[in-house]
Amino acid sequence: MNSEKKSYALVTGACSGIGYQFARALAARHYCLVMVSNRDKEIHEAATRVAGDYGVDTRPLCLDLARPTAARELLDFCDGLDVEVLINNAGVFSFADVSPRTPPFLELILGLHVETLSKLTVLFGERMKQRGGGYILNSSSLAGYFAFPGISLYAATKGYVRLFSESLWYEYRPHHVTVMALCPGAVATDLYGLPTFYQNLGVRLGIICRPEKMVDKALNRLFKGRRVYIPYPLLNVPMKWMMELLPSGLIRFIYQKVKRFQK
């Protein structure tokens, strides 16, 4: 990619965690950045750090991506920019049973993981077709492959993201636009509510991956035209099949144990 052309990468959920690492990795590849988050102070600070470290143009935007109008607002914000890469990373997570208190969270998670992600993919995908090519990475999850209590909403929406992205890979491929679903297992971020001690322990045991390592490998696969990427396949691919075969009693037992580690 020629930096003189000022090609941009748009990253949602970019102020921390996986999204921030995507922003840094893309800046290292000489992309200018549009960095989006619903935390105003944090996204401006993150954009300033990335610009200082890599010398690229960064444009921070504080925006609630769960709003029905968010995708169109973001498209308008990027008007006139040559957006070559879209990283749909923004998301939420809750480990809890479905209850009468669920509907507000249901609206939030559907807005982020389904509605806005889909709209951004289609809107920017059309612009990429017009420019002659581009790359879209949609963050799914290994959880999108199986059912598990406590993450019913999260897993269902991530399953949608995976299937939506895989289908669009075929539709957009003739237009030189790659759409890839990223399906990680456990990642060492604060999204899942796992205390830092257990995050670090998981990394040492090799069952939780560092976001910066995963991000770099994911981008390499995206730029090679992959349809799906499951990081750490020797661990996560067998895990995917194993979870589908577990008896219900063992799943309930694991569920009760996992609840103890939530903040």
Protein language model features and the residues they cover:
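Residue(s) in the substrate-gating loop at a strand-loop-helix junction
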Residues: 141
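Active-site helix of classical SDR
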Residues: 121, 157
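Conserved glycine-rich cofactor-binding loop
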Residues: 13-17
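Conserved mid-core segment of classical short-chain dehydrogenase/reductases
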Residues: 76, 85, 93-107, 150
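The beta1-alpha1 cofactor-binding region of Rossmann-like NAD(H)/NADP(H)-dependent oxidoreductases
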Residues: 41, 61-73, 103
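Conserved glycine-rich Rossmann-like NAD(P)H-binding loop of the short-chain dehydrogenase/reductase
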Residues: 29-45
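SDR active-site lid
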Residues: 170-235
